């Protein structure tokens, strides 16, 4: 690093590393999921000698992160609930990758869901206000089915018939 105005050169420590993150790998966003991102020019991209893709953590690591934020859920019952929450998240992630839904549940969302569960004491309501209400209305049935698979509990959104959804789509 050169500080021209001070006529000084700063040498980095031998262990110095610089990391950057990008949801679009510098390519910009045509999907609208990351509004406001810009494409990075090739000169800038060429300065990064290593580019790596990081996917979601294994379930047990995600569990550890959630429990670190919510130690009150460390009981066997709490861990069972968090495990099911992570299973719902994994279903949304797979559906997102397959193009079936446009909203994905991040580990941050799982933490928020667990925190809301502590507040509201209702797994379905906390799911709805944390994640389901953020989903496209036409995709809520699919997402509600993921919840039903993992918690064996029906949500009103999962009971909507495809006819109801198609009528809403036509009305818009």
Predicted regions and their residues:
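C-terminal regulatory/interaction module of P-loop NTP-utilizing enzymes
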Residues: 1-172
């Amino acid at each position: 690093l050169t500080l021209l105005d001070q006529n000084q050169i700063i040498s980095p420590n031998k262990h110095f590393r610089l990391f950057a993150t990008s949801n679009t790998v510098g390519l910009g966003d045509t999907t609208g999921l990351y509004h406001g991102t810009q494409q990075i020019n090739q000169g800038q991209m060429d300065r990064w000698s290593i580019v790596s893709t990081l996917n979601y953590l294994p379930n047990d690591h995600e569990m550890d992160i959630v429990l670190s934020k919510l130690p009150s859920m460390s009981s066997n019952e709490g861990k069972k609930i968090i495990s099911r929450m992570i299973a719902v998240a994994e279903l949304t992630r797979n559906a997102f990758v397959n193009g079936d839904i446009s909203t994905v549940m991040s580990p941050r969302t799982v933490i928020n869901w667990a925190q809301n569960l502590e507040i509201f004491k209702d797994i379905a309501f906390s799911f709805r206000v944390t994640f389901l209400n953020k989903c496209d209305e036409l995709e809520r049935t699919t997402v509600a089915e993921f919840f039903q698979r993992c918690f064996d509990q029906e949500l009103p959104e999962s009971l909507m018939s495809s006819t109801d959804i198609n009528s809403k789509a036509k009305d818009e």
